[in-house]
């Protein structure tokens, strides 16, 4: 199991410049941890850039993974990570979910650069 950050889903869905790097992880969607905050960000992005129908298709793909809702324990862990690593709310929730599930976070978001258990792809 792994957690692919929102930027990874976007790269993969749009065949972006890093799509081939994410493809290795996206081949088995069922093995991906998907925080509901990633679903929120992906839906918001796809609705804005594409349309509601495409946004719902993207969310349907995420539903094939293991969707993790925001819980009290993840919220508290995120609060600690936000303070310790100066992460935004959404980034802290995503990182806390990965840590709570004991999986690596796969991302190209610089906010996660050099954090433990992160695989980072430079844009």
Go through each PLM region and give its residues.
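A generic structural signal for short hydrophobic patches within well-formed alpha-helices
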Residues: 9-10, 39, 75, 112-113
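Acidic, PIN/NYN-like endoribonuclease modules and their adjacent C-terminal/linker elements
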Residues: 1, 96-123
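Short hydrophobic interaction/assembly module
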Residues: 50-74
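Structured helix-beta-strand junction loops
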Residues: 28-29, 64-65, 101, 115
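Short, well-structured N-terminal submotif of metal-dependent ribonuclease cores
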Residues: 1-34, 46-57, 123
């Amino acid at each position: 199991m792994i957690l692919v950050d929102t930027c990874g889903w976007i790269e993969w869905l749009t065949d972006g410049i890093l799509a081939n790097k994410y493809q290795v992880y996206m081949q088995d969607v069922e093995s991906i941890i998907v925080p509901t905050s990633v679903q929120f960000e992906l839906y918001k992005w796809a609705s804005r850039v594409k349309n509601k129908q495409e946004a719902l298709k993207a969310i349907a793909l995420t539903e094939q993974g293991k969707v993790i809702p925001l819980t009290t324990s993840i919220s508290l862990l995120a609060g600690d990570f936000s303070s310790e690593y100066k992460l935004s709310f959404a980034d802290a929730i995503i990182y806390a979910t990965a840590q709570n599930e004991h999986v690596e976070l796969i991302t190209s978001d610089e906010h996660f650069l050099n954090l433990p258990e992160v695989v980072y792809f430079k844009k």
